[in-house]
Design a protein with these regions (language model features):
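Secondary-structure transition/capping motifs at alpha-helix termini
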Residues: 1-2, 35-42, 63, 67, ...
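Structured secondary-structure scaffolds
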Residues: 1-47, 99-103, 153-365, 409-411
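N-terminal catalytic cores of NTP/NDP-binding nucleotidyl/phosphoryl-transfer enzymes
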Residues: 2-74, 93-108, 113, 130, ...
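A glycine-rich helix N-cap at a beta->alpha junction
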Residues: 76-88
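Cys/His-rich short segments
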Residues: 114-167, 171
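Helix-rich, typically C-terminal accessory recognition domains appended to large enzymatic cores
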Residues: 119, 326, 331, 339-376, ...
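Intrinsic disorder at enzyme termini
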Residues: 469, 473-542
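Phosphate-backbone binding interfaces of nucleic-acid-interacting proteins
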Residues: 524-642
């Protein structure tokens, strides 16, 4: 039976669509999950969404929808992003799932019956965006110490969790084990929250209704942290019959989360488990933030980075690599478009991409793609072979400890050494004399072996591109197995290479920065009470120039070169026309066929991804979604819209 490994991301709060900051934790966990699977572990990788709370309730009310309708749309975008970024999660939990609700109600009741939860009155400060209560002494300049926003007075009946009874136990747990990483976080928790006096935690609310009801006191809903944290065990079947592998996977091998919620995962969560007499998780890694141009990302600041844009322009693996490469262990990192593009060019296009393309091209040019089996070694080979042979042992603990940036450094040291080895051995000079063929074959074989080892260790980080590398260098699945990565000389002596595409094309940084700034510029929302002059007034004569007509969509298909464009055939009662529209992210072709629409009939033809477009559909920008204006099915095609 294989050893098990259970790791989790935090469950994300779907108050808005995901951005690059959400991607760091998820890609970091996905990398570890893939690496442990390479090692032969039975992995359970959990992610999901934390969907209750006052903030969600308020945002849903603003949009005129129910909280469940509000989160459903955003959760779908999270899942779409994880699919785009090749996240190999095993389970996705939503706190609105029935089985999770059942577990939370049982846990709350059990803790109440054991005397760990009691009823009282909460008086203090509350931050709605963070869903956090604070004492006056914890505020920074009178504002929330986590997000810096205004707090409000709260005074309501509530249930409390007796954290104070476990102050000594939790301090001992944090200081005498290696649970919380990096170690600097331990001092933060002990000095800021435990030593000043660990306070009991408010765990229910009566001032809003969007939450899990306390089944023995219906006017209360379970407050965020008992609800959210319990996902790590409800997803395994604890307290419900949905799953039955709690005994198999618990305790968790690693929880990973951003530093702002380390307090709840390092203090509240272990205490809840102690109260339930359950084993404690083995490790918690609290990573830093990705800042954009030196400032923490925030939708309210308009500085979030859209990962869909980056993945479409530069490839998923380049984005996965970059966001892990520049995050120092336990510290914040600064994300800028220029840094990202420079990193892609330097590491992926120049170092890795050139190493693969040059090596494969030389094997193809000098030996027709298949190396001869004769070999002549030289002292020049020893350092490269030694570095490649020991790389797996060096990188393994780094990946297991979420030190992904350091793991990348070690791998690219070997890649850089291999590029230097090409210059030292000068294969193009050896190729001029047939008597050097055995030596030339040795040099190329050493390069192919180095690429095999490096690409296999990079595959958890870049799972889509590395199989292409293996195909080019003639490596089979057995050649890149984990148990072969500490051995040099695994490829067949007469290995055959196969030239392929350029894996990471070089980027024109200056022009790309301009384009990214345009694509990621925050949309300006014109409020109803703004002066219309600001939006631009047109005359009736100008408006009369626009010819609007009705039509029926008779056929629709995706354009292969784009993730955003659909090619639409419209019956306009005048012979038909083709319209290309950027709505593929919001509608499938099947949803549109047969729909009656309004289109601009006298728009000049335009070429989009090689397809001619003769018109434009009418649609409205509905917040996070674009909605096409559909007409009644009985509307005649070709009618003029007045």
């Amino acid at each position: 039976m294989n050893k098990t490994y259970y790791l989790t991301t935090p469950i994300y709060y779907p108050s808005g669509n995901p951005h690059i900051g959400h991607c760091y934790t998820t890609v970091a966990c996905d990398t570890i999950a893939r690496f442990k699977r390479m090692q032969g572990y039975d992995v359970m990788f959990l992610t999901g969404t934390d969907e209750h709370g006052q903030k969600i309730e308020l945002k849903a009310a603003e949009k005129g929808v129910t909280p469940k309708e509000y989160v459903d749309e955003i959760v779908a975008n999270f899942k779409r992003l994880w699919e785009t970024m090749h996240i190999s999660y095993d389970r996705f939990i939503r706190t609105t799932d029935d089985y999770h609700i059942e577990t939370v109600q049982k846990i709350f009741k059990k803790l109440y019956e054991k005397g760990y939860i009691y009823k009282g009155t909460y008086k203090g400060k509350y931050c709605t965006p963070c869903e956090s209560f604070w004492t006056e002494s914890q505020l920074v300049d009178g504002k929330c110490p986590d997000c810096g926003r205004e707090v409000k007075e709260a005074n309501e009946e509530a249930y409390f969790l007796r954290l104070s009874d476990f102050a000594d136990k939790i301090e001992k747990f944090l200081t005498e084990t290696d649970y919380l990483q990096p170690k600097s976080r331990v001092n933060e928790m002990v000095n800021n929250f435990i030593k000043p006096g660990l306070e009991d935690l408010c765990v229910s609310r009566t001032s809003f209704t969007w939450g899990i009801p306390v089944d023995f006191d219906s006017k209360h809903v379970v407050y965020v942290w008992v609800d959210a944290l319990s996902n790590y065990i409800s997803a395994l079947g604890y307290g419900n019959e949905k799953y039955n592998d709690f005994e198999k996977y618990w305790p968790a091998d690693m929880h990973m989360t951003a530093k702002e919620i380390v307090r709840f995962h390092s203090i509240v969560w272990p205490i809840i488990l102690m109260m339930l007499d359950l084993p404690l998780p083995k490790h918690l890694y609290g990573h830093g933030w990705i800042n954009f141009n030196g400032d923490k990302m925030s939708k309210s600041k308009g500085n979030v980075v859209d990962p869909f844009v980056l993945c479409e322009r530069y490839g998923v693996d380049a984005v996965r690599y970059q966001i892990l490469r520049d995050m120092p262990y336990g510290s914040d990192c600064n994300f800028t478009n220029e840094l990202m593009l420079t990193r892609i060019n330097a590491d992926l296009a120049n170092d890795l991409g050139n190493l693969v393309s040059r090596t494969v091209a030389m094997a193809d040019k000098y030996f027709g793609g298949t190396l001869p089996t004769d070999r002549v070694s030289d002292e020049l080979d020893n350092q490269l072979i030694g570095m490649a042979q020991s790389l797996c042992d060096t990188v393994t603990p780094l990946i297991e400890q979420a030190q992904h940036s350091k793991a990348h450094e070690e791998i690219f040291k070997v890649i850089s050494r291999a590029n230097k080895y090409i210059d030292e051995t000068a294969p193009w000079v050896l190729a001029k004399d047939e008597s050097n063929n055995a030596r030339l074959a040795t040099v190329l074989y050493n390069l192919l072996e180095t690429i095999r080892i490096c690409s296999a260790l990079l595959s958890p980080f870049m799972p889509a591109t590395m199989p292409e590398v293996w195909e080019q260098i003639g490596a089979g699945a057995e050649d890149t197995a984990f148990d072969k990565l500490g051995t040099f000389g695994v490829l067949r002596a007469d290995v055959t290479v196969k030239k392929g595409r350029v894996l990471f094309p070089r980027i024109d940084i200056k022009s790309e920065i301009t384009e990214l700034e345009r694509l990621m510029k925050p949309k300006t929302v014109i409020k109803e009470d703004e002066d219309l002059d600001k939006a631009g007034i047109i005359s009736i004569d100008d408006f009369a120039k626009v010819k609007l007509r009705t039509g029926e969509i008779t056929a629709c298909e995706k354009i292969k070169k784009s993730k955003k464009l659909l090619k639409i055939q419209v019956d306009d009662a005048r012979g038909g026309r083709q319209i290309v529209s950027g709505i593929a992210e919001y509608y499938t072709p099947e949803e549109l066929i047969g729909k009656k629409i309004i289109f601009v009939a006298n728009l000049a033809p335009a070429k989009l991804c090689g397809e001619e477009s003769n018109g434009m559909l009418l649609a409205c920008d509905a917040g996070e979604k674009v909605q096409v204006v559909f007409l009644d099915k009985d509307t005649p095609n070709g009618s003029t819209v007045r």
